[in-house]
């Protein structure tokens, strides 16, 4: 690739960034009503433009099949009439959510007489890099608009036509509501250099949110000069304590693994206290077998689940995203927590127990973005948490942690109210 070509891409991304920065200022100043009007207008535009979106998507699907892409990826790319309608409905749902922008908390009087508090404000410009799912274009744009942020979207090259078609409707809807169309921009090139330029532009982009495979996220985390909201893996654990109710334990373990296999909040390792193993594991093993799940277990697990195969050290760190589960029998609570500390990716962990003291210890001692008691890890989701929608999940400790909804797309500034006060 020529230096001239790379320079052209960098200049294009720089121009997009400048336009986003200017639009972001206008969005931040806009009122809740204007942003909600924009979301409603975009939803209407997507419905009215559904045939154009479907045609663009059909071209992407044809190219993907000709290129021999994985059928599962092609399925994620497809925009059926129902999925297109779901994009519009999702935007209306976002419009109905409470607006975090401008909310003031902890306003209190100080001994000097001033009042000090914190006001929630948009972050500014959010870059979102994602793969295969073109519906993310509308979902992510909607969350950013509602929270008063401009956004730059860089979708997967395999869905470039679909993303452009959706972006046209988003721009038109923003302008219908009197807001700048540059508030949402899609990077129009499929060149990988565009990603490199976007993540190294702190003067125009305030944060990057990568949504995709581990390789993509690792590259962005390694190369970015802009803060990144991310998670790499979802190695989630369920620990069945000796004080667990057997019926609850079996139901939670089976649901956490089988309700949906390919998600980041699916359980990948099951830990069982040795005092509970004989009454829990045979039934768990039977139901997992019926669901087509391969169990990779320690020696004590294999003694209780006939179909289990030996687990290796690698299994304890693997996010399978498929019909495989690692199972280990542990001495008890402390052993389980030690295993989680060593192998967890920091996403979601759950304990099944009827012991209130142990449940409280688990909540305090396990340092993951979501920690649960007597509930399936599959609940680690913005919709289930009452956020309405999420831009992604973060396993970092700064700035947002866990499911990132509207509030996670804002920041706080200090506000001070006085009446002629001067400092003595």
Swiss-Prot record:
Keyword field contains rRNA-binding: no
This enzyme's EC code(s): 1.2.1.41
GO molecular-function term, one example from the UniProt record: glutamate-5-semialdehyde dehydrogenase activity
Keywords tagged on the record: Amino-acid biosynthesis, Cytoplasm, NADP, Oxidoreductase, Proline biosynthesis
Reaction equations catalysed: L-glutamate 5-semialdehyde + phosphate + NADP(+) = L-glutamyl 5-phosphate + NADPH + H(+)
UniProt keyword Ligase present: no
GO cellular component, one term: cytoplasm
HAMAP family, per the entry: ProA
Function, as annotated: Catalyzes the NADPH-dependent reduction of L-glutamate 5-phosphate into L-glutamate 5-semialdehyde and phosphate. The product spontaneously undergoes cyclization to form 1-pyrroline-5-carboxylate.
Protein name: Gamma-glutamyl phosphate reductase
